[in-house]
Amino acid sequence: MKQQVEVKDLKEGKYVIIDDEACVIKSISKSKPGKHGAAKARVEAIGLFDNQKRSYIGSVANKIYVPIVERKSAQVISITGDIAQLMDMGDFSTFEIVIPDEYKDKVKEGEEVSYITALGKIKLDIRT
């Protein structure tokens, strides 16, 4: 799910959709309006799921999509190799997710973990 906002309303640390990917905004710079033009904004962001750097350049009056990012908790049911089967604690649905290398020692069967979901994608979000 996504919603539309104007570029001038974006803030650092919030989310934005660039190239059909949910991204976290790292920096925003705005130029002054010229004699015959509108002010421009440059948004630098990093992909939430792929960690790729992306940028958007456009008028501050333009509308841009913002993803609806949800943080949820789930219980680890089983671990097979680098794939974990999780059960959502809210609606009790089960799904599988690949465990990133940095979380392999932190994810254990029976424990509760948090995850992020946006634009139909899921990512583990373990904060220490």
Swiss-Prot record:
Molecular-function GO term, any one: translation elongation factor activity
Listed under GO biological process in this entry are:
positive regulation of translational elongation; positive regulation of translational termination; translational elongation
InterPro entries of this UniProt entry? IF5A-like (IPR001884), IF5A-like_N (IPR048670), NA-bd_OB-fold (IPR012340), Rib_uL2_dom2 (IPR014722), Trans_elong_IF5A_hypusine_site (IPR019769), Transl_elong_IF5A_arc (IPR022847), Transl_elong_IF5A_C (IPR020189), Translation_prot_SH3-like_sf (IPR008991)
Q: Which domain of life is it from?
A: Archaea
Keywords (alphabetical) are: Cytoplasm, Hypusine, Initiation factor, Protein biosynthesis
Q: Which SUPFAM superfamilies match?
A: Nucleic acid-binding proteins (SSF50249), Translation proteins SH3-like domain (SSF50104)
Question: Which terms in the GO cellular component ontology are assigned?
Answer: cytoplasm
Sites bearing Hypusine, chain numbering: 35
Localization recorded for this chain is: Cytoplasm
Q: What is its main location?
A: cytoplasm
Function, as annotated:
Functions by promoting the formation of the first peptide bond.
Q: Which PANTHER family match?
A: TRANSLATION INITIATION FACTOR 5A FAMILY MEMBER
Question: What NCBIfam families does the record point to?
Answer: eIF_5A, PRK03999.1
The Swiss-Prot or TrEMBL record describes its family as follows: Belongs to the eIF-5A family.
The name on file for this protein is: Translation initiation factor 5A
Q: Which organism is it from?
A: Methanosarcina acetivorans (strain ATCC 35395 / DSM 2834 / JCM 12185 / C2A)
Tell me what gene encodes this: eif5a
